């Protein structure tokens, strides 16, 4: 109840499209599941993924491949948890973001460096004066909103390296 996230349990129904593609099944499993905790220190993560074939275009890797979905999921969970706890979502993010490196996630991903806390502070500073702009917009019949989200992007694909040595 103090806002410390201790676990994340995710069940995903993943659309693989109409046929098996090169890396289609790896997107909702390896590429998605490994980054589910985002840039938050969550010690326990459970991911259950069921892939289904549909009558849509086959899914394959292109720009991000599973990571945008994982980041969206954890950020929505943070927003919902903050609402249910009656806590400011930005405060909840700051409380749970990891700051020590290297950081090993519950799903086996090692993040070697980052400055997530600094990025949040920079975003808050960049939004200075937002309330005044919101009030001004409201007088003109326009609505403004402000949201924060963290995004973790890994620099490589699969979490392993392969080499073959021949003599």
Please give the residue ranges for each predicted region.
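Glycine-rich loop/linker segments at domain edges
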Residues: 1-77, 152-160
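Predominant activation on well-ordered alpha-helical scaffold segments within soluble catalytic domains
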Residues: 43, 71, 75-79, 90, ...
């Amino acid at each position: 109840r103090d806002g410390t996230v201790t676990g994340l349990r995710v069940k995903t129904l993943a659309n693989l499209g109409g046929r098996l593609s090169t890396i289609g099944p790896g997107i909702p499993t390896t590429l998605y599941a490994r980054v589910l905790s985002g840039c938050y220190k969550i010690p326990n993560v459970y991911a259950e993924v069921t892939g289904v074939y549909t009558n849509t275009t086959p899914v394959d890797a292109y720009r991000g491949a599973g990571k945008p979905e994982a980041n969206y999921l954890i950020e929505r969970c943070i927003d919902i948890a903050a609402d249910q706890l009656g806590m400011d979502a930005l405060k909840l993010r700051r409380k749970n973001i990891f700051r020590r490196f290297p950081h090993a996630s519950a799903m086996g991903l090692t993040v070697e460096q980052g400055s997530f806390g600094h990025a949040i502070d920079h975003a808050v500073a960049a939004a200075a004066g937002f309330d005044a702009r919101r009030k001004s917009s409201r007088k003109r019949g326009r609505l403004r909103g402000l949201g924060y989200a963290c995004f973790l992007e890994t620099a490589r694909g699969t979490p392993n390296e392969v080499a073959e040595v021949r003599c």
